[in-house]
Amino acid sequence: GSEMCKETGYADTAYKLLLQPDAPGWLYEVGKGATTVWETWTGIDENGKPHESLNHYSYGAICGWLFGGVCGIRYTDGALAIAPTPDKSLGWAKAAYDSPAGRIVSGWRYDGDAVTYEFEIPANLTADVTLPDGRKFTLAPGKHTV
C-alpha cells in the first residue's frame, strides 16, 4: 500500500490516497463519520447503511505509514533512523513513538516552499537522519530543529 508507494518513488500517490475525499480514499471514511478503520473503502453505502465490518484492520497499514513514511520514524533493535517524506498537500505532520529507549518525535511543517523539521531523540540514543533533499546526518539526544 502506502509504504510501497513511498519506497518505489510514488509517495505523491500515497498522499493522494490519504487526502482523497471519495472512495478509494481515507477521507471518504472520515467524511462518513468513521472513528475506526473499515473492512472496505465503502463500508457504508450512499444511504448510510453499513454493509461490511466498520472495525477491521484490513487497511490499517495507513497508521504505520503515517509513522514510518510521513514522519519517517524507524526504530529497530535499538537503532533509530528517521527519513520523513513531507508533502505540501498535507502541510504538516508530527508523530511521537514511545520506544523502549524513550520518546521519539519527528515532525515537519511547510512554510511557503520551505520545510522545517523538528526531531526529539531520547537519552542514550542517536538518530541517523535522511532528508528528501539528500542531506544525511546523525543527531544526538535532545530536541533539534533543522
Each model region followed by its residue ranges:
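Short, small-residue-biased leader/transition segments that mark boundaries at the very start
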Residues: 1-5
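Non-catalytic C-terminal accessory modules of carbohydrate-active enzymes
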Residues: 12-146
